[in-house]
Every structure is written in C-alpha cells, then in structure tokens.
C-alpha cells in the first residue's frame, strides 16, 4: 500500500466526518483496530492488504472520477475472500455509501490541503524522509513512529500513547496533503545554488556581449595552443623513434662486422697452427744464432765482420737473422724487425793476453816479512805468476794455497786439531787392528781411539775451551802483513772436538 492510498483514506474518513455519514463505521473500525495493534504494533503486510481491499470496495463507484488526482494509483479489484476475512475480524463496513458525499469529501480535502500549504523547505524535508524510509528495510524504520520523520505521536484520544494506526494515518495525510498541492509551485521556484564543482554553465545570464566575445577568443586561443603542444609532442616522439631505429641499425652492422672479424681471426689462427707443424724455416731458425766475436751483435756489425773476415761462417743467411742479428726461435717476439738499426753499446772483445800486458808491476811492501807466505809468490809480468801458482799447487798444508787450490777435497768426519804439549797418552796408539789414528799428522781424538781419565782430562783440559796458550806478540808477527796475523782460523784448528 503506497502513501497515496493513505492520503485517500485519510481524506475520506478522518478530516471530513461532518460531511460523511460514517461515524459509526469509524468507531467500529477503531475498535477492531485497537485490538489488532495490541498484538501487532507494526504495520504488517496482512494489515496493508486488508486496508487496500476495504478502500477498493468503498471507492469502486467513484474510481473513474478520481483517477486523475490519485497520482497514477490504480485501485485493485475487490476479492471476495478478502472481504470475508475483514468480516471475520469484525471490521465489516456497509456498502451502502452514496457517491455524492465521497466526491464532496475528496474535493474538500483538496481545498484544505491547498490552504495548509507549506514552503519548499518542508517539501524537501518530506521528500528526503520518504526516500530514507522506503530504502531502509530495518525493523526500526518499519515502525509507525519512525515513519513520521521522528515525530512521536503522544496522547491521542483513543490510543493514549500506544502506536495507533489512526494517528499514523493522520500525520502522514497532513504532510502528503500539503505536498500534493504545492508540487506545482515547487517546480516554478528558483533552482538552489550549486554545491559541488563541475563545468561552468555555457552561458551566464548576467554576462555582457563583450565578455562573451572575450571568452570565445580566449577559448579559441587555448585550443590552438593545445593543438601546437600536441603537435610538438608528436614530432619529438617521431624524432626519438627515428634516432632509436638508426642506432639499432648501427648496432646490428657493428655486430656483423665484429662477427666477421672474429671468424677471420679464428681462420688465421687455425692456418698458423697447422703451418707450424710442417714449417721447415722455423726448425732451422731455432738452432741459428747470429753472433759477432762470440757476442750477439746487430746487423751492422755482422755485415762488417762478414765482409772483413771469416765471421760469415757464423752468420745465417736467412731473412730473419741476416737483417736483425738476433736469436730466432718459436717465439716471434724475439724478432726485432720493427726496431731501429742503431748499433748496440757493446764493448769490443779483447784477448786475455793483451789485458795482462796492461797490468802494472808494483813493488812489494817492505813491511811484509820475508817469511810471509805472500813473499813466496812474487808477481811477475806476462802471466808468469800463473805458472808459479800451478807449480806450487802440490803443497796442501799452506792456508794461503787452499784458496787457490781447485782440486775437490774429501770431507773429513772429524775436526782436526793438535795437542799443545803432547802429554795426552793414547791407550790404543799401537793398535794396528783399528783404523788410522792420524790424518796428515793430526791424531784422531774419538772415544774409540783412546781412553780418557781424570788425570788426562785435568792435564789436557775438559775439551770445552781452547787449550792453546795465550797469544804473545813477537817480532815476527808484528811485522807481518795484516792478512797474515794469527787468528783462530788462520792455522789448523786448536779446538778440542766436542
């Protein structure tokens, strides 16, 4: 049941009681409805259907006359079973109702609605409340109290604080009656101010023709500037695209060139590797050395030496060595083809005899004693000193000749030394079964060759310190050369073997 049906019902039965002979009908309806509201305080679908059926039965005679004022509401047909249900509830309504009082009642309700017209604000509030109520389906909004936009119905004549259906219909009819008549005036009122953004209207009412012309010129100028900006962006994009394509083509060409060079390099390396195994020239160059007088010389000296003497026999007549004069082999880096032909800084090779001739003869130092070992070998010219050294090389006892002796000596097993006083007695000196007891006149002092006692140890020493006497300078030692002064290692060792 819509709000229009409520409006019609209230206009017919609530506000026009003196004009309609239905006071008893309303009394019976309120009595039956009061009992229903106690058990069902809300407006249920069953109650709504019963009200629609009752209104359809009452308005069947005047349906054609009031279709234009019902906002497109079509009253459904009356069903017999619905009427029976209403009679069973004690809500029977007599059907002998004349059409004339109803028509007068409808006209009177319209007149009252027009006199009690409200402002546009009340109409907007009512519309907002109705939309909120119809969209919300919660139990709080289906109640009759919340249905009236928060207005609580308190202290009615029949209900007394209870949610009375009659009071609900009266409140709704008051708002709807004023809204139905004032809808035409609401359409003709001024439009409210815009609350949000959005595009400006095409034409303002208070704009002069000059301002309109300026606006048109400004819009045209903005359009042209936007078109130029778009064209500039398109041109720049096209230029960048062309540049990228050119760079990609260049990259492809360079990649192909690199691949071609790599392939040629591999082919050359393969040919070189296969040629080295069968090349005869490399084998001959590995053994050829270009020399000049026993030294590696540049090409200039080689050519001069080969033209003047028989040095050409040492010169290899091939392309590598004849021009460079270098050692050739497997490594090509030794070949100095790209080097300059400037002569090397080499000293000329001279004979040893010519070098000995330039040695200056110096007199011997008078301070050297005649008994010195250096006095035995005077230096003579023309290499005679070498012959003297070789002739005297048989003497192995002289410490000065040991340095000149080139014959390898056998390494001794013990350290040779001499006893100072000869008081050490060997118990096995005459034992011929043992090994040799002397090496070059030096007795071998080992545990296997002699027996030591306390007397011999105290007489000869403990063997931990040198047993030679103190070094007393004499006239001969003072006059000797500094190289001939007695040192612990200048003569055969005087240390006891450990």
From Swiss-Prot:
Its main location: nucleus. Keywords: Activator, DNA-binding, Nucleus, Phosphoprotein, Transcription, Transcription regulation. It holds the Pfam family bZIP_1. The modification Phosphoserine is found at residue 342. Residues 108-127, 333-343 have a biased composition (Polar residues). Residues 212-275 form the bZIP domain. It comes from the Eukaryota. PROSITE patterns: BZIP (PS50217), BZIP_BASIC (PS00036). Residues 240-247 are annotated as: Leucine-zipper. GO terms for molecular function: DNA binding; DNA-binding transcription factor activity, RNA polymerase II-specific; RNA polymerase II cis-regulatory region sequence-specific DNA binding. InterPro entries: AP-1, bZIP, bZIP_sf. Residues 135-144, 177-191, 304-325 have a biased composition (Low complexity). It is found in: Nucleus. Developmentally regulated transcription factor AP-1 binds and recognizes the enhancer DNA sequence: 5'-TGA[CG]TCA-3'. May play a role in the function or determination of a particular subset of cells in the developing embryo. It is able to carry out its function either independently of or in conjunction with Jra. This is Transcription factor kayak. It comes from Drosophila simulans. The gene is kay.
